[in-house]
């Protein structure tokens, strides 16, 4: 059984696709999770959530209240398509508008943390100008988040600009704002040439949540747990010993699998077994 001090959540894209959040949260509860992380990616379908009506937003809040399963975080990867670092003024403006809408949405439905994708640009070539635009966009975004009391948290990425906690800390120091923090992915962190334990310790005062997935060098998605390079037990031990008490989120993309729930149960049991070995939870 999970300790009450260690919330364990599941990524929306691990569960069957669809727009009924009551069903999704009920399933997450059945599978033993404390929360679900919402995805707002670059697809028109998920981007349209930011334009939900008052009634649609209220339906999500009611589903949270009815099930007791929270939606405390949003993975905002839409900036791949509309990057804050774009050299196109119109694209940058659209990226900031997405950020504004995401912050307003979070404020309305009770989302506390918006995980940001650490790309200055994704589909274009990066340069000094794209990085400058990215910094400026982050500064404006954090000002909006501060007014709304919503935390923006940078993910450690599959991309050189933000592939370590050390690099993300540079942005945290530059912005110098309590509403900008870090949301590391231990899979992405492990896939690069990082001293993972040192990196986790360095970021501990800024880490608000942790993504849990396996990876291989150059392969950042859909690596089955146990088949990659991540030393989960050591990562969990380091975080525990460093005083981290926040949430862990199992990140998977099994929504199109033949039986998503079965895939999730398998991953949940595997992760909880490593948590138990690290002394974080009771052994099953």
UniProtKB/Swiss-Prot annotation:
Q: Which domain of life, per UniProt?
A: Bacteria
Q: Where are the membrane-spanning stretches? A: none
Pathway where this protein functions = Cofactor degradation; L-ascorbate degradation; D-xylulose 5-phosphate from L-ascorbate: step 3/4
Q: What is its EC number?
A: 5.1.3.22
What is catalyzed by this enzyme?
L-ribulose 5-phosphate = L-xylulose 5-phosphate
A Pfam family annotated for this chain is AP_endonuc_2
**Which keywords does UniProt give here?**
Isomerase
Q: List the induction conditions.
A: Induced by L-ascorbate. Repressed by UlaR.
GO BP annotations listed: L-ascorbic acid catabolic process
Gene Ontology molecular function, alphabetical = intramolecular oxidoreductase activity, interconverting aldoses and ketoses; L-ribulose-5-phosphate 3-epimerase activity
Gene3D superfamilies linked: Divalent-metal-dependent TIM barrel enzymes
Family indicated by similarity: Belongs to the L-ribulose-5-phosphate 3-epimerase family.
Q: What does this protein do?
A: Catalyzes the isomerization of L-xylulose-5-phosphate to L-ribulose-5-phosphate. Is involved in the anaerobic L-ascorbate utilization.
Instruction: Tell me what this protein is called.
Output: L-ribulose-5-phosphate 3-epimerase UlaE
What lineage, starting at the top, does this entry show?
Bacteria, Pseudomonadati, Pseudomonadota, Gammaproteobacteria, Enterobacterales
